Design a protein with these regions (language model features):
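N-terminal cap/lid segment of alpha/beta-hydrolase-fold proteins
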Residues: 5-56, 91, 122-128, 327, ...
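Surface beta-strand/loop "capping" patches
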Residues: 298-340, 357-370
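Short, surface-exposed "cap/lid" segments of acyl-processing enzymes
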Residues: 38-40, 45-103
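Histidine-bearing beta->alpha loop at or near hydrolase active sites
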Residues: 263, 271-295, 358
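Cap/lid segment of the alpha/beta-hydrolase catalytic domain
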Residues: 88-132, 193-201
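Gly/Ser-rich "nucleophile elbow"/oxyanion-hole loop immediately N-terminal to the catalytic nucleophile
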Residues: 117-162, 178
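Short beta-strand/loop motif that positions the catalytic acidic residue
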Residues: 242, 248-250
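Hydrolase active-site cap/lid region
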Residues: 170-219, 277-280, 285-289
Length: 387
């Protein structure tokens, strides 16, 4: 992958298409050509939002996106820009599509994986140009703000959802300008273990992965070519590189992954790291409002060079009747909720989670609670609100 990312791109260029001045800042639109991949020139819509007050001129936020509603994207960028006092941007059309008989999204990614396995041509995997488009977008943002505002950006916070979240992880593995990441609804780290675990929990792979399973990409995971591919496209292969701050934005009912997919990589991820689970949310995070507010707080901390909240917890099983949970934080705890549901197995895709506020000493950096153990099955997680 790194050979592809580092390859010179003669087709790289950008040009302004429209600038809108608003009371709160400016919205600038650009046409970006990131590369030529297998004869196809990749063209993107790049939007850069600049708030009136720039208190953090050295950092920018970049969202990797597909073909979503640009108005909603800009509204989110405005919130993030005003909260962080920094430039924010969205890169659209990742990946460029459709290609190869109308394939899009996972069907296109899976097809390119299969073509690599058939031909051995290392330029095939679609995640390579997806990651490179983000790298070239960062180049363009640096060039644009330096040319137009005499501003030097050295740090990036990168965010993307699903396949774009996958590209977020991989971009952070290869580009040192990325000093924090916030991947959303992507539980693909440690692919081999995830596939094995999904088969155990569901009895088969999730139907959401059918584009991959129909090509039998979940089989022969020990095959030499498959191992080579996995070493390129599995973020877990680069896990030691993820030393930057990380916020994982997930949904409790995401049907792509098991509810405990974190078990296969969380403990191996270097600090600092945080998780936010949107309750009763699938792959779309129920519209993403809770995730956006959490992301805004995360971005503000990173932009202002402030440390992330650090949370540690211990569990004690008491006579197999309940679990005592002890929580320590470097920030005062404003509230703590117990979100729970029950399942006889680990398939939580259709479960309804309910919340119970727990009594704590407000503004203490310590909290403890007791969770009754179910007679059978599985349940529960905790959510903290920090001041």
């Amino acid at each position: 992958m790194e050979n592809y990312i580092n390859r010179t791109e003669p087709d790289y260029r950008w040009e302004p298409t429209k600038v809108l001045n608003e009371p709160w800042g400016t919205i600038a639109h650009y046409k970006l050509v990131s590369q030529k991949w297998r004869g196809h020139v990749w063209t993107h819509h790049l939007v850069i939002v600049r708030p009136c007050s720039i208190r953090n001129p050295d950092i920018a936020f970049l969202k990797i996106s597909g073909d979503g509603d640009i108005k909603n994207q800009i509204n989110s960028l405005k919130i993030l820009a005003e909260r962080s006092g920094a430039v924010t941007a969205v890169l659209m059309n990742v990946p460029n599509q459709p290609f190869y008989e109308g394939r899009c999204e996972d069907a296109l990614i899976a097809y390119t994986f299969k073509q690599y396995l058939k031909t051995g041509d290392e330029t095939w995997p679609l995640l390579f140009p997806m990651v490179k488009s983000a790298v070239k977008a960062m180049d363009a943002i640096q060039d644009i703000v330096k040319l137009e505002h005499k501003q030097q950006i050295n740090r990036f916070v990168v965010n993307g959802a699903s396949k774009r979240g996958w590209a977020t992880w991989l971009a952070a593995a290869v580009d040192k300008r990325i000093t924090a990441i916030a991947p959303m609804v992507i539980g693909t780290l440690n692919i081999k273990a995830q596939l094995h675990w999904s088969e155990q929990i569901y009895g088969k792979q999730s139907t959401k992965l059918k584009d991959y399973t129909e090509l039998n990409l979940h089989r022969n995971v020990g095959n030499e070519a498959m191992q080579k591919l996995r070493n390129w496209i599995d973020p877990y292969a680069y896990i030691h590189r993820f030393t930057m701050p990380k916020l994982l934005l997930l949904g409790t009912n995401d049907p792509f992954w098991t509810v405990d997919s974190l078990r296969h990589y969380w403990h191996d991820l270097p600090e600092p790291k945080l998780i936010y689970q949107t309750p009763n949310a699938g792959h779309d995070l129920n519209g993403g409002d809770q995730a956006l507010q959490t992301l805004a707080a995360f971005l503000e901390l990173i932009a202002d060079h402030k440390p992330l909240p650090k949370i540690a917890w211990k569990f004690n099983n008491v006579a197999n009747t309940h679990i005592n949970v002890h929580i320590d934080s470097n920030e005062p705890v404003g509230a703590i909720s117990l979100w729970s549901t029950h399942s006889d197995d680990l398939d939580f895709r259709n479960n309804q989670w309910t919340a119970q506020k727990l009594n704590i000493t407000r503004d203490s950096s310590h909290a403890k609670t007791s969770i009754p153990l179910p007679h059978s099955g599985y349940q529960a997680y905790l959510r903290l609100c920090l001041r």
